UniProtKB/Swiss-Prot annotation:
It comes from Staphylococcus saprophyticus subsp. saprophyticus (strain ATCC 15305 / DSM 20229 / NCIMB 8711 / NCTC 7292 / S-41). InterPro entries: Helicase_ATP-bd, Helicase_C-like, P-loop_NTPase, SEC_C_motif, SecA, SecA_CS, SecA_DEAD, SecA_motor_DEAD. This is Protein translocase subunit SecA. Belongs to the SecA family. It is found in: Cell membrane; Cytoplasm. One of its GO terms (molecular function) is protein-exporting ATPase activity. Its EC number is 7.4.2.8. Keywords: ATP-binding, Cell membrane, Cytoplasm, Membrane, Metal-binding, Nucleotide-binding, Protein transport, Translocase, Translocation, Transport, Zinc. CDD domains: DEXDc_SecA (cd17928), SF2_C_secA (cd18803). One of its GO terms (cellular component) is cytosol. It catalyses: ATP + H2O + cellular proteinSide 1 = ADP + phosphate + cellular proteinSide 2.
Amino acid sequence: MGFLSKIADGNKKEIKRLGKLADKVLALEEDMSILTDEEIKAKTSAFQEKLQSEEDIKKQNKILDDILPEAFALVREGSKRVFNMIPYKVQVMGGIAIHGGDISEMRTGEGKTLTATMPVYLNALTGRGVHVITVNEYLSSVQSQEMAELYEFLGLSVGLNLNSKTTTEKREAYACDITYCTNNELGFDYLRDNMVNYAEERVMRPLNFAIIDEVDSILIDEARTPLIISGEAEKSTSLYTQANVFAKMLKSEDDYNYDEKTKAVQLTEQGIDKAERMFKIDNLYDVNNVDVISHINTALRAHVTLQRDVDYMVNKGEVLIVDQFTGRTMPGRRFSEGLHQAIEAKEGVKIQNESKTMASITFQNYFRMYNKLSGMTGTAKTEEEEFRNIYNMTVTQIPTNKPVQRVDKPDLIYISQKGKFDAVVQDVIEKHKAGQPVLLGTVAVETSEYISNLLKKNGVRHDVLNAKNHEREADIVAGAGQRGAVTIATNMAGRGTDIKLGDGVQELGGLAVIGTERHESRRIDDQLRGRSGRQGDKGDSRFYLSLQDELMVRFGSERLQNMMNRLGMDDSTPIESKMVSRAVESAQKRVEGNNFDARKRVLEYDDVLRKQREIIYGERNSIIDSDESGGLVNDMLRSTLERSVNYYVNEEADDPDYEPFINYVDDVFLNEGDIKVEDIKGKDNEDIFEFVWNKVEIALKDQKEKIGTQFDEFERMILLRSIDTHWTDHIDTMDQLRQGIHLRSYGQQNPLRDYQNEGHQLFDTMMQNIEEDVSKYILKSVVSVEDDLERDKTTDFGKAEHVSAEDGKEKAKAEPYVKDEHIGRNDPCPCGSGKKYKNCHGA
């Protein structure tokens, strides 16, 4: 039996199991219908009491499984009373799969939002919190508002967490039984919680259970995008301008080679000569010219591989990334590694400064921290291997409530794009005349505008939905199923609104979906098709392709071109064959395989930083949560002193030189003259350590007496500042190491192993530097304690809850940023301290 057959067979078994359990839920319908509203709330309280009296998570999970039929039946009854809707059996099955920590694949229009209410309610009973995660704040707001009515009727609290919320509002939202939020905001709140100086500034509780709507979009499409909080690095932008001027001068093939399959750009020998002349250097690849070659490569990528209105747009002097999967612009997001600055130079807009990373995490590593993770989507089966390998989740295809009536017609392939678009327009005109609504899917903004112009010339009224006019999205989608409607949409993925058919449209054949190009991901094609034929409606879909489409050019359209030429086919005659569809699907699988490998690689590298992040965040949290930090400081002092003795004093030598050691002790631990050469001469290292340690203990005692009752607070402040300063520098160093490590493969080395080894060494060095800094500041600081500590505490409390005398409002929290968005030197520090960035993490 092949791998796919096993999966299909496994899905059948799982559906059978889910069906039996769903029948138990449905069997309780009558029992629930006789309960009063008060009795329903009382059931919730009884469930909560039973679960919350048990602290062990494994035992709690066992109780959850036991009460599932009754809890799900209660939600069905609540839904009937609140919404006048009762979840179907297939929705109950989907809910059971979600509760099991898996992914429910449910077709468009099958009611995923209502399906989620059952596992959300069940898991919220533990009191540990449930996060319902959506791809944008609009969906979070709408869903939380609609579903709060049901959850509150059942006796649970619901919170909504948005980027605009204050710290106090966020804390209240996370304290609720159920919290609606976007994936971005969750990640940023997690990072910010690990940058605070006081426990009361945290907003989140420990991560428990998450249900991700459009799970493939978040865990697959966005997996490679790290969430990053960054500060300004204050580097010059002049090299970007010079590299841009240079890139404009170059000619393809003469000066550089471009591989369309891998999208790699490389200078030729002639290009290298030109670079050396322009930048007035002898050898471009000299180690001192790393910055120059890096900027040239980035400028080439900006000019050759990225296209305006396809990969990014320029709006009001700002470069905005276009999401390749949804067609939306992503304000606030920036390309990393200087690419955004290179595009700004290319487009002649203001070049923003580069940034320095202060905290970062990928979605892959963030979501793996939950006790239980689950999701739902219309399309996930094609990525099942990735879900299983990385997140330990299986995909269960839930049957539809009514049979699917949509007809998916074979692809039509033309020699040129002109022939293809002419045929598309002709098809639209015919369907429009008959009154059948048409949804045209494109993969780029410029394609949607090109087709729009063709339709205008032919007098066909239509709406365009792309990154340039997403404000009208809900209105356009709502009208797309009406009689005679023609809608052009760039990548329909992630559009959270169903297309409902107008009166008389069923008789005309339902919604017709026309794809103008295959996306490199089969999921996006399936999502476009899935907009038609919802809930048993009629509909049809067809893709029009050409040999000039990007996917065909990248993956072997030459054979097809030769075949069409041999057959003497002209531009207006398409091929309709299974061989073509198979070739396209094969190309898509190759791209998906490449993308999966790339995401796995990102995870392998990020895992190095993940382990280090866990150590640092664990250390910070124990400092913040403990009443005193004296034990940790003592350990750091001993460790630093021990290392310095072994480093500076060679006890094997006949006449060791003690001066370097004494200078070090004077600098870090004691005052000048506290120890002399004769005090330690002739002693072995162990005795030297004990002698100096006795003096360090006396110095520490003196410092405690000077500072008094505030000493614990002083220790904690020194510890946190030292950790934060060195950790920020370490992240930046690791980032630089990562960017250059792939070049090691040319020297027959394993880049990942080198990154792991060197990353480990860098981390050890960082920890030693933290210990040395803490030792020095604890013993050597001369502080006006009341002023310094009072200032630190006042701004902290002011950040969280203090009412400012200036405006009577709570201070706004620092905004999060994704890669390369920067924080100005005088802006509030995003760690939440309330200080300016330059006086805090930017110091």
